[in-house]
Amino acid sequence: MNFYSMPTRRGAQTFFAKSSKEGETFAKALQSALNAEINSKEGGRQYSALCAEKYILECSPYPSAIVECGFLSNYADEINLQKTEYQMRLASVLCGVCKRVLKRRCR
């Protein structure tokens, strides 16, 4: 979850390490699915995956992404993030992308 100074900002956002092309591809796949299944439907917005200098991303030997599932500074996101149904939708989207990525890597 994220907090932003403008309470109108809402939705799920992904981040990747600048040094990882595979991580960037993974984050973009996650973001695309989140845009289609969550962001467009809940807030009418779409976002791009962003490059971030975060320790957990830089030090991972595997393609990695951070997913922020919503903004606590946005009331609608705060309410949604507390609902089991919304959490399950998020989990389903993320799991679906992970399964597709792993399936491609195992070929």
Map each language-model feature to its residues.
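Active-site-proximal helix/loop segments of hydrolytic enzymes
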Residues: 1-107
